[in-house]
């Protein structure tokens, strides 16, 4: 009886917390953001690049998904947390094109989707403060297969404001 209650509790929590889930080809439920995204990426013809091309990259993709869940997704309603996360991401992307390796990965796609509402609300001046993450965001959004239904956000090509020293 305890097992049934635990299973029922699990499914209630999944529903309440809106945890992503899907049904695998074999009929099994796949639950959790990383699990669902990894499963779908495995089905892709581009799975090696999406999940990482070596063990270090695969671990890094997983770390970024955890960071996304712990930091990025939790700061949407808090201006100070949003600034902190954008500063961290901006510093990280200073000398990188993508979050992991030299090509687009699941980390880039998920972070893009998570940051889209934030970037949609930023002014040009705010976008310029986070120039490296803005450059990365603009690169990712121009892949229409990733952007899909989301609106294309406008980024200025020139500095419009004087940087504060």
Model regions: which residues?
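Poly-acidic low-complexity segments
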Residues: 14-15, 90, 131, 138, ...
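Short acidic/histidine-centered micro-motifs embedded in hydrophobic/aromatic stretches
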Residues: 39, 64-67, 112, 136, ...
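Residue-level signal for alpha-helical context at structural boundaries
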Residues: 54, 79, 107, 127-128, ...
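GST superfamily/GST-like fold recognition
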Residues: 99-122, 127-140
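GST-like domain detector, emphasizing the conserved glutathione-binding G-site
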Residues: 1-99, 103, 116-121, 165
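Short alpha-helical linear motifs
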Residues: 84-86, 131, 154-160
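C-terminal helix/juxtamembrane-tail motif
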Residues: 145-165
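Short, mixed-charge aromatic SLiMs
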Residues: 59-70, 133-147
């Amino acid at each position: 009886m305890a097992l049934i209650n635990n299973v029922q509790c699990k499914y209630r929590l999944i529903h309440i917390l809106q945890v992503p889930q899907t049904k695998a080809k074999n009929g099994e439920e796949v639950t959790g953001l990383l699990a669902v995204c990894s499963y779908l990426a495995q089905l892709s013809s581009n799975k090696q690049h999406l999940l990482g091309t070596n063990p270090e990259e695969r671990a890094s993709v997983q770390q970024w998904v955890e960071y996304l869940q712990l930091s990025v997704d939790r700061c949407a309603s808090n201006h100070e947390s949003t600034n902190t996360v954008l500063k961290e991401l901006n510093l990280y992307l200073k000398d990188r094109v993508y979050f992991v390796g030299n090509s687009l990965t699941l980390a880039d796609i998920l972070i893009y989707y998570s940051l889209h509402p934030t970037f949609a609300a930023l002014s040009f001046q705010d976008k310029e403060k986070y120039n490296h993450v803005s450059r990365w965001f603009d690169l990712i959004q121009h892949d229409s297969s990733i952007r899909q239904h989301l609106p294309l956000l406008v980024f200025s090509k020139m500095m419009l404001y004087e940087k504060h020293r």
